[in-house]
């Protein structure tokens, strides 16, 4: 993907997610429950009941699980053998993300920079350090260089750190591919 003379252009929606999220969610207004801590999901004859951490249970015709497979198994009260087999195959990896303004994690020459900049340490068991050039990705016209680094293995100037976050990302391995094919 990276060449010095012909770099691919990252496509973004004008106005960002503030533009398209309201358009996508408007038809769902009043029909979708979000930001509710679900403790259990149980199936009935004609409905699915959600037990919440901080509100009374609610029943629905259908439920969409927007979470990792292990999370489905921890809240689904009565998973079938097939569901257990499928959802246990979706594994995740934990990643530390650091939002910062330390441009030293990008290549020194601006023309050598890409949207995603990888730093490998040679150990196949260690995830790469990836620094996203947010100015390039988000077309930011600011004098400050904004970066998001995953799994930093080199020191980031602490005065430049705007936030640290821990994420779990799905592993796209053979188990996941086979599980998707079964569902």
Which stretches of residues belong to each language-model region?
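Short, loop-centered acidic/histidine patches that primarily coordinate divalent metals
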Residues: 15, 151-153, 177
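Short glycine/proline-rich, acidic loop/turn segments that cap or connect secondary-structure elements
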Residues: 174-183
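Mid-domain catalytic core of redox enzymes
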Residues: 39-172
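Active-site/ligand-binding neighborhood in enzyme catalytic cores
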Residues: 1-42
